Amino acid sequence: MKEFFATCPKGLENLLADELTTLGAEQVRETVAGVHFKGELAIGYKACLWSRFASRIVLVLSEFQMNDDLDLYLGAHTIPWEEHFSGTSTIAVDFTGTNPAIRNTQYGALKIKDAIVDRFTKRGHVRPDVDKKAPDIRIMAHLGKGKANITLDLSGPALHQRFYRQGTGEAPLKENLACAMIARSGWAGEPMMDPMCGSGTLLIEAAFIAADMAPALRRERFGFDRWLQHDSELWQSLMMEAQVRAKRGMQRCEVKLFGCDADPRVLMKARDNAKAAGVAHLITFKQADVTQLENPLPMPAVVEGEVSQEEARQVGMLISNPPYGERLGEFPALLEVHQALGDALRRGFQGWRVSILSASPELLSCLRLRADKQYRLFNGALECQLRNYQIALDSVASQKEVAQDFANRLRKNLKTLEKWASKEGIDCYRLYDADLPEYNAAIDRYQDYLVVQEYAAPKDIPAQKTRQRLLDMVQAAIKVTGMDGEKVILKVRERQEGKQQYQKLAAEQHRMEVQEYGARLWVNLYDYLDTGLFLDHRQTRRMLGQMAKGKRFLNLFAYTGSATVHAGLGGASETTTVDMSHTYLNWAQDNMRLNSLVGRQHKFVQADCLKWLSEADDQYDLIFIDPPTFSNSKRMDESFDVQRDHLLLMQHLKRLLAADGTLVFSNNKRHFKMDLAGLEAAGLKAQNITSKTRPKDFERNQHIHNCWIITHAEAPAEA
């Protein structure tokens, strides 16, 4: 009796153990990501041919205590390798695990290879060569818990490969995981549907099961082909038996399988895969997204008075592995997909059983279905849940609105602000700003896009609860506004005093043009925490435009230069835009070009604003400065705190401000206190105009910013 080991993805061990027992294996014992078993050679062959869950089947050659590299070498050297392959065969050694003596897997593999070669050489045999890509014999070794385990691979290419793939979607489901989903769903051959079938893996594997087709029947190469102990006669008899079973199974197979996908290119690959697998006649493919999902089974005719149409309707099994996204920004569109799937199931699949795999419990919750069972599976290293549901016969598509209080508030805000924005001539505004404490986020509208920015929740609120509320908000926002889920951008930021550090989120570029009181401005909704336009300063920018005619304008800490655009359009004779960021200064120039504001009268300076201010000596009639609340950038020589340093800032600006000039000073420091006495001593006076610069969509947030007009003491302050 030989000892074997079958590897598998985590979560499949129990299924694999039962399968091996059914094949005739003895002393079956589960471990993490694998199953030990014993049997005659035929059992090893059957496992290679028939296992739907295994990744590899290996023959255990030796297991021994190992403390250092010498133990590994000697243990490998004692194995009678010449009984397993000849010197003319090529070999590869795969090694996993480390200890203080074997600190990397390459070294472990090298010691075993040396032991093999030395044994062949000492016995006067030709030494085998190494071929890492396509060896005749693959030796696999694992080091763990002080023991080395050396095995010979019988599988060849990994057993999840069925050799029917002609092409795949972006993230193909491995075949053994697909089989685990089918097994855990409880499918018993009834009609099956995959509404997001991708390359068709689930449906093709289901067809193999229904037709009693061995999963490895199509492969041409196994790891034992060049093994000296290979029994070709035994193997051929097992293959012939499998072929007969497949032929008979296909003849009597009447299973109904249905697959849908929104992508016609992926669907074409699914059809090609099914054809290559020999099961195309069992699967009906249709291009459709989940919003178009329909029950593929016909509604039967019934005799009035006997049974209802719903009771007579044929039911089936729906199994799917919807996309679950690993990046936060993908979630809004995926929420919409899962919500639509749940609605479709309640609307048209009454009585069906449903099994959905996802790495996101939050997305599964968007189905609004109660699971009967739940299983833990792994898609590669990603932990997933497989949830089984039963759609009630009397279920209906309409459900209680998600986050109803939030949805009602958003609906109210939308009704008020949409009309106001249209009248004002703006197409981006704040729609919601943590109006309800339990829904702690800001939602900004940019034309037909929504940007949802989550604020950090208090530490005493569980992260899972916070996450679920955020996803509920996104779901409700999509429904209330009618926005496409793909045009909802989700961001996470902490509520801080002042502006955030401008953190880059991605390398991609997504620019779009928006309108603001006649100004055309570029915004980027995806790539930064901020979009390039601070909406709360909209009235301030408009005011600057109205004040700018014929004036020399300076914009310090200019960000993307939107205030400069308004000043330029307002007729400023010249503008100077200063910012430390090369990225934002280029953005400012793009904004100016978009409004045909070009020429030498418009200057752009990349510099540390505080250092530039201390050295500048030009005069300006209108100055706008909106510094950060706090900054300690690597490019700055020292830190800046707006509360601590604003008086020094004003003293520098006084030197640049023309005798009858106006300085507009704004910041986002909550509870900022202007040093009026210090200003007076410096020969300046200030007027608080915050209430005049706070736009309608920020009326609820009294501390979003504060704004001041500052002039020389002898000049009248402008309102």
Curated annotation (Swiss-Prot):
Where in or outside the cell it occurs: the entry states: Cytoplasm
UniProt cross-references to Gene3D superfamilies, sorted A to Z: 3.30.2130.30, RNA methyltransferase domain (HRMD) like, Vaccinia Virus protein VP39
Q: Which domain of life is it from?
A: Bacteria
A Pfam family this chain is assigned to: Methyltrans_SAM
Which EC number(s) are documented for this chain? 2.1.1.173, 2.1.1.264
- Supply one GO molecular-function term: rRNA (guanine-N7-)-methyltransferase activity
Every THUMP domain range: 43-154
Identify the enzyme class: transferase
Q: Which InterPro entries match?
A: 23SrRNA_methyltr_KL (IPR017244), DNA_methylase_N6_adenine_CS (IPR002052), RlmKL-like_Mtase (IPR000241), RlmKL-like_Mtase_CS (IPR053943), RlmL_1st (IPR054170), SAM-dep_methyl-trfase (IPR019614), SAM-dependent_MTases_sf (IPR029063), THUMP_dom (IPR004114)
| Reaction(s) this enzyme catalyzes, per UniProt | guanosine(2445) in 23S rRNA + S-adenosyl-L-methionine = N(2)-methylguanosine(2445) in 23S rRNA + S-adenosyl-L-homocysteine + H(+); guanosine(2069) in 23S rRNA + S-adenosyl-L-methionine = N(2)-methylguanosine(2069) in 23S rRNA + S-adenosyl-L-homocysteine + H(+)
- What SMART domains does its record include? THUMP (SM00981)
Query: What UniProt keywords are attached to this protein's entry?
Result: Cytoplasm, Methyltransferase, RNA-binding, rRNA processing, S-adenosyl-L-methionine, Transferase
Entry's Gene Ontology cellular component terms: cytoplasm
Stated role: Specifically methylates the guanine in position 2445 (m2G2445) and the guanine in position 2069 (m7G2069) of 23S rRNA.
Under the heading NCBIfam families, the entry gives: PRK11783.1
Task: Fetch the PANTHER family from UniProt.
Answer: RIBOSOMAL RNA LARGE SUBUNIT METHYLTRANSFERASE K/L, RIBOSOMAL RNA LARGE SUBUNIT METHYLTRANSFERASE K_L
Q: Which family does it belong to?
A: Belongs to the methyltransferase superfamily. RlmKL family.
What name is this protein filed under? Ribosomal RNA large subunit methyltransferase K/L
Q: Which gene encodes it?
A: rlmL
